[in-house]
């Protein structure tokens, strides 16, 4: 996937390998993330310091890691340095050394990060929500693992994951910038065409089951003065045929400052500093959810107001003036997302990863403009959850809100200090 862009002598790349956390073994969650993070910590004949010095000396950028469904390497470099950087990319992806010292260092840092992130519930509530709403499905696996799963990982686990899941058949590379397509294609093929297939089958997660009924996950953070809440269920996949109409609905309902949800909770209600509707999509169904936070004493009021907005849009849809305003907003916001080489490369790679064509970008604003009011109402009815089928995830002072939030459904309670996965597996306290 190559695109020439000659206005500046810069090249950006995004390389993605199918896999990611969905191929972590049960009880060894976090393996993909450690594997991805270690790619640049020793590769070929260079150690971590030498790789960092090379990239820095060229004024370049190199990042590696893993997400839910894929592992990645991305970066930027000057066009004159493309041979050196392509050689480095090939080393990082094909010849990582996974030094024991770097493994132990990154593992310790990852555990510390999980602990420190719990100081701000907004950083972790999504992990709790995914693990709770997806249950036994692979999407329930937190990408970074938890304190317990990381502690039990060894360098051998990382090596096993890499050997099973990295290979030429999994690789997708997109480059955008100041180069000749023919020459760049030749250079990439010279470095990657003989990379053998990964031994393991590529991931093929099953369709997850949408939870029925109401239930509550309450994570106790005794020193909290606010309650963070996530209220939702499963949504749609990346290839949903109504995806553009759904983008319009999502933006109008909770995707901009003047959205219905933020207006009700922040502008009119004064109950929060921000509220939004989150709707990530994956190969299989993602999620749709209200996300916000409020003072402990106004927790129930804020949740009830949020639920009222959800019920209202399901019942009545979104008025034509709001739909029209939202479409104009989206059309204005879209071009700045595709200005730099890195933005373009990332967008094209993301489309290709999910089996979408480049025309998704080229036709996006015209498809937004063509979205009708009835399309928005129809997709809301199909995708947005009813009040009877909702998962509630709350992080706050359980002693002060436990009794009140019980009205939303059966409560499973954890402590913020509990490792995420083992806490959920043990169930209610």
Which residue ranges define each predicted feature?
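An aromatic/glycine/proline-enriched structural segment found at the starts
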Residues: 135, 139, 143, 172-237, ...
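Short, charged, amphipathic alpha-helices and their helix-cap/turn boundaries
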Residues: 150-154
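Non-catalytic, conformational "gating/processing" segments within enzyme and secreted inhibitor domains
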Residues: 126-127, 155-191, 385-391
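Short, surface-exposed beta-strand/loop micro-motifs that present aromatic residues
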Residues: 1-4, 159-164, 213-221, 377-382
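M16 family metallopeptidases and their MPP-like homologs
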Residues: 3, 7-40, 46-94, 106-112, ...
